[in-house]
Regions:
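Phosphate/nucleotide-donor binding subsite
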Residues: 64-109
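Short glycine/serine/threonine-rich phosphate/pyrophosphate-binding segments
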Residues: 25-32, 56, 93-107, 111-125, ...
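Glycine-rich phosphate/diphosphate-binding loop of Rossmann-like nucleotide-binding domains
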Residues: 29-30, 42-48, 54-57, 162-231, ...
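N-terminal phosphate-binding or glycine-rich loops at protein starts, especially the Walker A/P-loop
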Residues: 2-57
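Glycine-rich beta-alpha junction loops
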Residues: 53-54, 76-78, 119, 160-162, ...
């Protein structure tokens, strides 16, 4: 199957997603279940599934939704979460992760989706897909639940590289704005630079330099720069894109996930406290379910590697079938919008 050459009987083009079946905490069964959920909702998705064929074939055969829509590529080796990226690159050419990326490199698939080791996935992606011309450091863009109309903000870098100088942060702003433009349909995304305060004199010298660089490039790149923002603005309405280095971004991401879990646990504990509180929970069930859906990390599952000659979506390692399906939905939307080509054009015009 070619990346966009397969056609459904209706005549509509089918977008092929390359899926790494191995490496996630839940194993290949959850990945295949997520694929089946996506296939049932969207007839325009096809898959190339990578992993040990002996394990994958029976799982796929059980899912009627996947009949005739999956090609299995036998890849016996599995990249584990504790494997060192440098070792994986040297010795992992028979792995499902390597094979999944190769399908994108060869043009057989439009996007790669993996739940595996983040460091190994990024290093493999950089080596096999290469960086876009002019990009210094690729970044991971993640979705953050927000009060904006699109219900999510974009934060990058989510952990691809703990280092980022002023030029890197400027490029993150450019790539993040392009992602928001294509993913959310925003004509002029608002971009903020994460700092310890909003005043222009605050923060490290490198951040102040990045502030000036982003401000100088905003108009030509069709985004609005709102200046420095603080951690409390991550879920807010001040901006649509938050730019930071990978260390800060990853700490913020994990803190947000932990806080969301704590809030959910405390709510369950409070509503189970007495018969009256249990009655209150029953009366508020619809509203609570709506709130849970808004902040459910599975709905925003999928960090996108930006700055490469190809699109890679990193799903959470602990993703269940719902989480995998969300990552595949994101991959389809990016493929449908020709995201990689549009991002490359934006970057080329800015350098």
């Amino acid at each position: 199957m070619g990346a966009q050459s397969d056609h459904h009987m209706t005549g509509a083009a089918r977008f092929v997603i390359s899926v790494d079946a191995m490496g996630g905490d839940e194993g290949p069964a959850a990945v295949v279940a997520g694929m089946a959920m996506s296939a049932a909702k969207n007839l325009r998705i096809g898959f190339i599934l990578h992993g040990p064929e002996g394990k994958l074939a029976p799982l796929v055969a059980k899912r009627r939704e996947l009949a005739g829509r999956v090609e299995i590529r036998d890849a016996p080796q599995v990249v584990e979460m504790n494997d060192k990226p440098s070792q994986v690159v040297r010795h992992g050419r028979d792995s499902s992760m390597w094979s999944a990326i190769e399908s994108v490199r060869a043009g057989e698939a439009t996007v790669c989706v993996s739940c595996g080791n983040t460091g190994a996935l990024m290093l493999m992606s950089v080596i096999r897909l290469r960086k876009l011309p002019g990009i210094y450091r690729p970044a991971i863009a993640v979705m953050w639940p927000s009060q904006n109309p699109q219900q999510h903000n974009i934060m990058l870098d989510g952990g691809a590289d703990i280092r980022a100088d002023a030029k890197d942060l400027m490029q993150y702003a450019l790539m993040g704005a392009s992602y928001a433009r294509n993913g959310f349909g925003l004509t002029c995304p608002r971009v903020g630079l994460l700092n310890v305060g909003t005043e222009e004199h605050k923060g490290r010298a490198e951040l102040r330099k990045a502030h000036d660089l982003i401000a100088a490039n905003a108009k030509a790149s069709d985004f609005e720069f709102v200046g420095f923002v603080e951690g409390r603005d991550l879920p807010g309405t001040i901006c649509d894109v938050i730019v930071t280095d990978g260390f800060t971004g990853n700490v913020a991401l994990k803190t947000g996930e932990g806080t969301a879990k704590l809030a959910g646990d405390l709510l369950r504990e409070a509503f189970a406290y007495s018969p009256l509180s249990r009655l209150a929970a029953l009366m508020a069930f619809t509203s609570l379910r709506r709130m849970k859906k808004r902040i459910d990390p599975r709905r925003a599952n999928g960090g996108v590697f930006l700055g490469l000659n190809g699109t890679v979506v990193k799903s959470h390692g602990s993703a269940d079938a719902t989480g995998v399906s969300s990552a595949i939905k994101l991959a389809f939307e990016l493929a449908q919008s020709n995201f990689t080509e549009r991002l490359a054009a934006r970057v080329a015009a800015a350098i």
